[in-house]
């Protein structure tokens, strides 16, 4: 079999290894494999993996689908490994459930595949998150995209119009005049306005969503973290003006998510909606390697008990005859909860941009599937 051979899903082949290559997702070939060696491989959609899931030889005759880019930056976002991840999605499902929506890159990829007739969804698409402000952003993209874009554009134009000067940084400007002295001042002014509006007005207001998007793009590496007084992530100090979504891109996203049901609720409640034949993707706050791991996604965070509860509920999906894929860190808590004898585990190398000292640092993640 060579690069021109027709690749058939769910079939085993014995081939002579001619070339080793990494995919964009960074799945590494085993170091023991050598050119000229005969090896039996399990063939998956669009490529080949060995029985342990460690080798991926891409089918070079199949071009990658260009997925819609997400609107938001998000810690732990899957944009960099999305081409690898979606290869493990089932080609047909009853309903799709995404329990930790975040930046939405996986949801947008799935919807792109559905539009291109690569995946068939017989029922509905559900997207859940415990972050109410985030869910409201997507709802406003669905129903109020024109007003949302106008409000966001107002903040962007004001931000772009602020020129550099020698005025000292003021992280607590008392009024708009002080806020307009520096871009950093303006960020903190809008952050305070967001926290005030989110607390005192309708949380689903278009202006709250516009502020959410603006702050997300100008804060430190797309983090979302809440404290007692609300959103508290510092300014991002980007050398170039961050790239905000264009009107045409917003229209594309709005069209893609038109029939998605966005739901603000806990993952415990979300599991109750899953039925036989459904497919579930979970990308929770990652299980920690140590006490410094980032878990401040929402005000009360994820603790050990929360992770264990999530893992048990995920494993119960077997009893419902539902398929799932979970992304998580390759740490002891995860690997012991999902033994290889019972679940398929795929190792993936990913960049962890939350690292302040080394933003290009990488780590090993896992895809867990039943």
Tell me what each language-model feature is:
Residues 54-97, 105-106, 358:
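S-adenosyl-L-methionine
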Residues 246-261, 311-325:
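A structural motif corresponding to the C-terminal end of an alpha-helix
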Residues 287-288, 297-370:
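Long, positively charged, glycine-interspersed low-complexity recognition regions
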């Amino acid at each position: 079999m060579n690069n021109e051979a027709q690749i058939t899903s769910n079939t085993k082949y014995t081939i002579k290894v001619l070339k080793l290559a990494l995919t964009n997702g960074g799945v590494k070939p085993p170091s023991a494999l050598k050119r000229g060696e005969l090896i039996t491989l399990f063939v998956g959609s669009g490529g080949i993996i060995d029985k342990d899931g460690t080798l991926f030889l891409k089918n070079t005759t199949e071009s990658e689908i260009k997925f819609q880019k997400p609107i938001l930056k998000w810690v732990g976002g899957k944009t960099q490994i999305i081409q690898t991840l979606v290869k493990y999605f089932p080609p047909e499902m009853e309903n799709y459930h995404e329990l930790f929506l975040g930046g939405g890159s996986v949801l947008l990829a799935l919807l792109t595949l559905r539009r291109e007739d690569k995946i068939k969804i017989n029922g509905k698409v559900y997207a859940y998150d415990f972050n109410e402000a985030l869910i409201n952003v997507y709802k406003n993209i669905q129903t109020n995209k024109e007003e949302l874009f106008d409000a966001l554009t107002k903040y962007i134009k004001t931000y772009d119009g602020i020129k550099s000067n020698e005025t000292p940084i003021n992280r607590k400007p008392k009024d708009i005049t002080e806020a307009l002295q520096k871009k950093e001042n303006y960020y903190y002014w809008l952050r305070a306005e967001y926290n005030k509006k989110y607390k005192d007005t309708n949380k689903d207001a278009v202006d709250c969503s516009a502020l959410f998007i603006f702050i997300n793009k100008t804060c430190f590496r797309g983090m979302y973290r809440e404290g007692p007084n609300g959103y508290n992530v510092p300014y991002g100090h980007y050398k170039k003006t961050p790239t905000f979504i264009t009107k045409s891109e917003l229209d594309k996203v709005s069209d893609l998510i038109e029939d998605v049901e966005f739901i603000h609720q806990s993952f415990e409640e979300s599991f109750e909606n899953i039925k036989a034949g459904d497919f579930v993707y979970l990308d929770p706050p990652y299980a920690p390697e140590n006490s410094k791991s980032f878990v401040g996604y929402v005000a009360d965070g994820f603790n050990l008990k929360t992770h264990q509860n999530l893992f048990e509920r995920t494993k119960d999906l077997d009893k419902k005859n539902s398929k799932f894929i979970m992304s998580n860190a390759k740490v002891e808590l995860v690997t012991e909860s999902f033994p290889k004898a019972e679940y398929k585990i795929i190792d993936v190398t990913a960049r962890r941009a939350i690292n302040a000292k080394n933003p290009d640092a990488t780590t090993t993640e896992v895809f867990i599937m039943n």
